[in-house]
Amino acid sequence: TGCSGTGRGGDTASTDGASAGFAADATIGVALPDKTSENWVLAGGLFEDGLKAAGFTGDVQYAPASNTVAEQQNQISAMITNGAKVIVIGAKDGKQLGTQLQQAADAGVKIIAYDRLIENTPNVDFYVAFDNYKVGELQGQALLDGLAARSGHGAPWNIELFSGSPDDANSAVFFNGAMSVLQPKIDDGT
């Protein structure tokens, strides 16, 4: 996946950094929540490779899994101080980055919330994620399909639902998507 645009003359912009409004070797920061999830490690590698291929200097950092959000806050502040033009953030806790995002706005740094919504601040320029509600719907349907496949083996079923981490704003969206599929079945007892 990549980004492109059109130049003033309508020509497709090239992939070098200068066409994006930054020097070809501008630093783009990427702050990810941890290295304990294969998804975040894969994303970090893809960011590193993509930024390098586009001519940018990538500064990809992971907050330690055992640490509080303070380490990610410090990493983001350092990226701003060190001159990052854009910072992509997979938030460790999307409700606790307001100070750093205000610092970014004051410095003219663009912020892209990646995969996890950043709340409690107006200083997010872009949000890039899957359709998390649809993901929840698919999770709910997968549960129903799995239970239907076992319907001859002791139905009805008792299920216990979990909505995810309270510091992940996407948890409620996943849960609501799943419940849009599950609640009608719960209500009618099927």
Segments predicted by a language model, with ranges:
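A residue-level marker of the well-folded mature domains of exported/periplasmic proteins
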Residues: 3-190
